[in-house]
């Protein structure tokens, strides 16, 4: 077996099948599929650090899977996860180092990572010694990274920065920014590969090794469609796979989990005559009907003057037709709670300026709002984009106080909204529950 199977993070959270079982189903499947290593992404902390650390320990005890992250430290400065792992193939040794994004500090609820630090700039400027150590013990060095390639400010430390500033890395297997690199990219002497999002692709890197030296590197992607008919794909050409049959044991496990899940998710709660837009590129750049509906549900459930929630918390659209409980959980998978805080008019302006600051680029913190009318110019300088804000047709008084409904993630300063980190006046219901009640009230079939 000369294959190395890796995942670049955010693997344990995001689908209903995963979320309702707190990531357990994915852990079982990773083991069944023979994964060698994963790096924690920001969403892998969504069930809390203790559960992730426990899962890593269980994986190490009972399987070959390793959870790798060199830059996640506890309060004493000790590494929480194993920093790297060596793999030998007929004497050819591959070293794999894990690197989690420092963005996690603002991309999951603070309570999920309490006591942890992610070394931030040290990921770039302090990692040379670790790479040198692994380089001495191996013939090929891979960084398994949940860092991303965005250069628009939404991602701080990028894999490209790693490649440019650290010597000795042969390959970076990257995640976080959902970037699709069909044949990878070369930065300095380092290859970077990234396979997009949501299992639309499987990334493959073929290494040709002669006398313990890599003489050729060929990265490519295999689409989901090609897996269904691999005879004409790169799988057939380079890996020799011409047909893919479902693994009976894996399929049986998935079917059993889906059966349990169906008891919850197939319940129809409402009907929509229009598509409710929650696509990533939409909710992170503009108001959408689904984003506005969620914010309106938050406002109505708390009696707030206005509501604001982050577009990055909306994870899917809802098509025309019946709306099931499962679809709502898929749209809002983070188990967030609606909270009520008191803010000033200036806080509202500051929050909106911050939320609109990265346009036209996508931003998980883009505000989906209700109860206010916003006049803005995306072409104005950052910090001067919000021209007017009206509540009930009246200009917002910057010195007055208002009740604002948001989610507990943002009320803790999540996504960088430090101006909303205010004492909570009221803890409401779960965000998915609030949306469900709104749909039942206004869109009951």
What annotation goes with each model-predicted range?
Residues 16-37, 144-152, 235-262, 329-343, ...:
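Short N-terminal signal/transit or membrane-insertion segments
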Residues 88, 207, 269, 273, ...:
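Immediate post-signal peptide segment of exported/extracytoplasmic ligand-binding proteins
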Residues 91, 101, 196, 268-276, ...:
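Short, flexible loop/turn elements at secondary-structure junctions
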Residues 6-12, 114-115, 159-163, 245-256, ...:
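Short, mixed-charge, low-aromatic patches
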Residues 64-71, 75, 82-84, 186-190, ...:
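Feature captures C-terminal
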Residues 1-234, 283-297, 307, 338, ...:
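Acidic, metal/ion-coordinating pockets
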Residues 105-106, 209-323, 412-414, 421, ...:
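A short C-terminal boundary segment appended to hydrolase-like catalytic domains
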């Amino acid at each position: 077996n000369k294959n190395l199977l890796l995942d670049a993070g955010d693997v344990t959270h995001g689908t209903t099948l995963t979320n309702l079982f707190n990531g357990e189903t994915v852990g079982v499947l990773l083991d069944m599929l023979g994964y060698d290593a994963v790096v924690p992404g920001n969403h892998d902390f969504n069930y809390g650090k203790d559960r992730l650390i426990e899962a890593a320990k269980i994986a190490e005890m009972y399987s070959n899977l390793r959870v790798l992250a060199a830059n996640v430290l506890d309060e004493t400065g000790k590494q929480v996860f194993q920093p790297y792992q060596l793999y030998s193939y007929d004497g050819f040794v591959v070293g794999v180092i894990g690197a989690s994004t420092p963005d996690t500090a603002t991309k999951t609820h603070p309570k999920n990572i309490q006591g942890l630090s992610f070394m931030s700039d040290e990921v770039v400027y302090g990692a040379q010694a670790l790479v040198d150590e692994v380089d001495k013990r191996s013939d090929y060095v891979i960084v398994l990274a949940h860092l991303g390639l965005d250069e628009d400010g939404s991602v701080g430390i990028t894999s490209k920065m790693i490649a440019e500033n650290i010597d000795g890395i042969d390959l970076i297997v990257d995640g976080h920014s959902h970037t699709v690199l069909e044949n990878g990219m070369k930065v300095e002497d380092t290859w970077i590969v990234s396979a997009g999002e949501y299992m639309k692709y499987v990334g493959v890197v073929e290494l040709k090794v002669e006398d313990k030296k890599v003489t050729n590197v060929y990265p490519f992607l295999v689409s989901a469609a090609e897996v269904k008919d691999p005879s004409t794909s790169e799988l057939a050409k380079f890996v020799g796979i011409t047909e893919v049959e479902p693994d009976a044991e894996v399929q049986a496990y998935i079917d059993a989990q889906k059966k349990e899940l169906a008891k919850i998710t197939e319940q129809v709660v409402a009907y929509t005559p229009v598509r409710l837009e929650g696509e990533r590129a939409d909710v992170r750049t503009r108001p959408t009907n689904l984003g506005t509906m969620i914010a309106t549900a938050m406002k109505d459930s708390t009696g707030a003057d206005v509501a604001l929630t982050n577009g990055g918390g909306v994870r899917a659209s809802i098509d025309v037709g019946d709306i099931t409980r499962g679809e709502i959980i898929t749209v809002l998978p983070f188990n967030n709670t609606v909270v009520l805080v008191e803010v000033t008019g200036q806080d509202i302006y500051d929050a909106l300026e911050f939320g609109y600051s990265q346009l036209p680029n996508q931003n998980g913190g883009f505000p989906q709002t209700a109860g206010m009318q916003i006049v803005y110019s995306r072409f104005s300088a950052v910090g001067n984009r919000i021209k007017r804000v009206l509540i009930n047709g009246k200009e917002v008084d910057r010195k007055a106080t208002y009740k604002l409904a948001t989610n507990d993630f943002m009320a803790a300063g999540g996504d960088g909204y430090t101006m909303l980190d205010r004492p909570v006046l009221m803890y409401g219901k779960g965000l998915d529950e609030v949306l469900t009640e709104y749909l039942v009230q206004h869109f009951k079939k």
